[in-house]
From Swiss-Prot:
The lineage of its organism: Bacteria, Pseudomonadati, Pseudomonadota, Gammaproteobacteria, Moraxellales. This enzyme is involved in nucleotide metabolism: it produces dUMP, the immediate precursor of thymidine nucleotides and it decreases the intracellular concentration of dUTP so that uracil cannot be incorporated into DNA. The gene is dut. This is Deoxyuridine 5'-triphosphate nucleotidohydrolase. It holds the Pfam family dUTPase. Disulfide bonds: none annotated. Gene3D superfamilies: 2.70.40.10.
Length: 154
């Protein structure tokens, strides 16, 4: 897969210098930046979550791929701005506007400005295994059923 369909829902995108077409920030960037498609700044209070539109829809079509929306590391580390659902999974057959659940996990209000890069979008391959119901696994792994800290912290 080399292309997905992008539907521009807000006429500012690609025509207003503040709302460029979605692109990667650098040649080495894995994802494209998703910008806040808002008309005026929005204050996200400490602990609050807001759903913010991107002004576009992306249709992948190929069920062997999915889109994921991830937080931007700088916003998360410096300002406590992450995704309310931690990771957004966008199915290949979804055709609606990409929305970003923006969560301010800090104790300080945050102002999100129009066209500000708030998240990133990646297309990833999807593996669809069949499931085989068994009474017991055919081999024991070294880990077994140990979980939630089973392997220690060091």
């Amino acid at each position: 897969m080399n292309a997905v369909q992008v539907k521009i829902l807000n006429p500012k995108i690609g025509t207003d210098a503040n709302f460029p077409m979605p692109t990667r920030a650098t040649d080495g960037s894995a994802g494209i930046d998703l910008r806040a498609c808002i008309d005026e700044p929005i204050t996200i209070k400490a602990g609050e979550t807001k759903l913010i539109g991107t002004g576009m829809a992306i249709y992948i079509a190929d069920p062997n791929y999915a889109g994921i929306i991830l937080p931007r590391s700088g916003l998360g580390h410096k300002h406590g701005i992450v995704l309310g659902n931690l990771v957004g999974l966008i199915d290949a057959d979804y055709q609606g506007e990409l929305m970003v659940s923006v969560w301010n996990r800090s104790d300080t209000d945050f102002v999100l400005n129009p066209a500000e890069r708030m998240a990133q979008y990646m297309v990833v391959p999807v593996v669809r295994p069949s499931f085989q119901v068994v009474e017991e696994f055919n081999e024991l792994s070294a880990r077994g059923a140990g979980g939630f800290g089973h392997s220690g912290r060091q």
